[in-house]
Amino acid sequence: MADVEDQLSDDEKVRIAAKFIIHAPPGEFNEVFNDVRLLLNNDNLLREGAAHAFAQYNVDQFTPVKVEGYDEQVLITEHGDLGNGKFWDPKNRVSFKFDHLRKEATDPRPQEPENAVESWRHSVETAMRAYVKEHYPNGVCTVYGKTIDGQQTIIACIESHQFQAKNFWNGRWRSEWKFTITPSTTQVVGILKIQVHYYEDGNVQLVSHKDIQDSLTVSNEVQTAKEFIKIVEAAENEYQTAINENYQTMSDTTFKALRRQLPVTRTKIDWNKILSYKIGKEMQNA
């Protein structure tokens, strides 16, 4: 193993380390980072060479963070990325610096939104926050309003997680919704993602996603926001139900086909009893 390690260049070592970090399960970034740090045994190389991996992980995972001086969390996403390590909090109208390794948000500064789309963004944000509060016990949402390719666009991101390291599991829900503000009707595009890692007496990961498309009637800001949330709620409810039903079916069929829970005799083997019996026979033979 040492010979193989010696043959790898620093670039190859960093590339491998970055892959481990990017694919770290939710809630386990620090554990993976510490393991990679021990394997690489070069802190400067890791910090400089894998910095992009830290950033990609936080952006991909919709990492929630509390900005210094503000109470409510904001999500780290590509839509709020201002470049040079700065991100945007559209609700509080501030930009801030984000340390991808420490996961700390500092140096908040005023950042005004695009006036042309702000009233729409605010209406969707109000409706979305109410929806998230109702359906996600630990949920955080961030709603952006942008002009993309000349079109006024609303982007809503949701993140909710449960980290239960003491019970050997961690999980995260992410969803992203987008629509353009056009007369009469528009198309809503969404992607839903679930990632769960269970690692007690084994190592099982659930990684699932679903793409959504639907049409939305565009009227005034408030009514459009309400109709948008109806689409979001229906799609996310359906997805969650399908995941639950699918894995119940797998538990009842696929998993049982792969491995019996009990032997053919339908009774569990008492290994202690067998061992005692075997030892007793051996003692008698002696």
Curated annotation (Swiss-Prot):
SUPFAM superfamilies, A to Z: Subunits of heterodimeric actin filament capping protein Capz (SSF90096)
Molecular functions (GO terms): actin filament binding
Single GO cellular component term: F-actin capping protein complex
Entry keyword annotation includes Chloroplast: no
Modified residues (Phosphoserine): S9
PROSITE patterns: F_ACTIN_CAPPING_A_1, F_ACTIN_CAPPING_A_2
Pfam families the record matches: F-actin_cap_A
Positions carrying N-acetylalanine: A2
A single GO BP: actin cytoskeleton organization
Keywords: Acetylation, Actin capping, Actin-binding, Phosphoprotein
Cysteine pairs bridged by disulfides in the record: none
Assembly behavior: Component of the F-actin capping complex, composed of a heterodimer of an alpha and a beta subunit. Component of the WASH complex, composed of F-actin-capping protein subunit alpha (CAPZA1, CAPZA2 or CAPZA3), F-actin-capping protein subunit beta (CAPZB), WASHC1, WASHC2, WASHC3, WASHC4 and WASHC5. Interacts with RCSD1/CAPZIP.
Function: F-actin-capping proteins bind in a Ca(2+)-independent manner to the fast growing ends of actin filaments (barbed end) thereby blocking the exchange of subunits at these ends. Unlike other capping proteins (such as gelsolin and severin), these proteins do not sever actin filaments.
Family, per entry: Belongs to the F-actin-capping protein alpha subunit family.
Protein known as: F-actin-capping protein subunit alpha-2
Source organism of this protein record: Ornithorhynchus anatinus (Duckbill platypus)
Gene name, Swiss-Prot/TrEMBL: CAPZA2
